[in-house]
């Protein structure tokens, strides 16, 4: 056993398929001399006798060269909670539906493990969001998000009254279901469902998308990654608390009068990639977008006839005969 190489497995143990694939992956990694580590909350279901068991804490991936995830985007977001502080790359094997964050599919498990064994992958960094909640100048919560952070109403029968600020200047006030702030990575998730734009991952920006706003000016915003977006939850006679959701997983109660500040995170999340396909191709594949009829520039150029020498070098019509 090569004691210097360790892979942390994070598994959606609620899926029997994921458990069986995790066992197969552990066997292959063990045969290659790579130690396997699992989270204590998943250890009983996985029943891997040779695996090291650790708590699901911020240092769970310490000493691991990669975090291999078997599940959907939700499982990958969960794995980011244990991989971010140690800057360990995450490699997702999609067992869910869209699986936008995943790098491979269930049928490619053997090839994926081969990439891990031979270290044939690149690592890209994805920006995150840092979120701070204050009330009367006192910090009441700190959170972070890889995909998005949303401030939403906590009661169905009430609207959330908010004022949005960008870089210290008030922008607009509205009532509605709330607002979602997103990274480019999260632009294909909640923000997309709320009507926000898709932003290519190499573009650094922060998105702010209103949720069912009752206002004339309530449009999706795209601001600089250096900007700070602040959302103030207004107080009025029947105002109820809001709820801050980060990546749809971690929640904080936000009382009326609170201020939520969203800025670029100090720690990015690292994703392992071994497919060099353009992001456009990933969009087409994941969303099953219709592209039939596309000819493409290269294909058109190949069909263009070669110009004759006379056409390439036309005579000077102004020249004397």
Would you name each region that the model predicts?
Residues 18-19, 74-79, 187-193:
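Short glycine/serine/threonine-rich phosphate/pyrophosphate-binding segments
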């Amino acid at each position: 056993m090569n004691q210097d190489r360790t892979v942390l497995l994070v598994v959606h143990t609620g899926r029997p398929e994921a458990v069986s694939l995790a066992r197969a992956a552990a066997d292959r990694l063990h045969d290659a001399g790579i130690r396997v580590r699992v989270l204590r909350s998943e250890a009983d279901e996985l029943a891997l006798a040779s695996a090291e068991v650790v708590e699901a804490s911020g240092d769970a991936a310490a000493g691991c060269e990669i975090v291999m995830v078997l599940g959907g985007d939700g499982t990958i977001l969960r794995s980011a909670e244990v991989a971010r502080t140690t800057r360990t790359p995450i490699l997702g094997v999609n067992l869910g539906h869209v699986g936008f964050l995943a790098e491979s599919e269930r049928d490619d498990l053997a090839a994926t493990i081969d990439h891990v064994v031979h270290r044939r992958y690149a690592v890209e960094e994805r920006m995150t969001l840092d979120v701070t909640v204050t009330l009367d100048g006192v910090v009441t919560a700190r959170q972070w998000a890889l995909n998005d952070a949303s401030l939403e109403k906590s009661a169905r029968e009430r609207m959330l009254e908010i004022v949005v600020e960008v870089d210290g200047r008030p922008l607009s006030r509205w009532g509605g279901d709330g607002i979602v702030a997103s990274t480019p990575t999260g632009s294909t998730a909640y923000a997309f469902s709320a009507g926000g734009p898709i932003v290519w991952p190499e573009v650094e920006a922060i998105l702010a998308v209103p949720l069912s706003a009752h206002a004339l000016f309530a449009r999706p915003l795209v601001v600089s990654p250096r900007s700070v977006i602040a959302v103030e939850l207004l107080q009025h006679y029947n105002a109820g608390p809001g709820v801050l959701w980060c990546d749809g997983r971690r929640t904080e109660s936000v009382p009326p009068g609170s201020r939520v500040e969203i800025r670029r995170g100090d720690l990015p999340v690292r994703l392992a990639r071994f497919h060099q396909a353009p992001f456009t191709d990933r969009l087409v594949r994941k969303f099953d977008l219709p592209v039939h009829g596309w000819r493409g520039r290269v294909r058109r150029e190949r069909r263009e006839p070669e110009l004759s020498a006379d056409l390439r070098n036309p005579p000077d019509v102004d020249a004397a005969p």
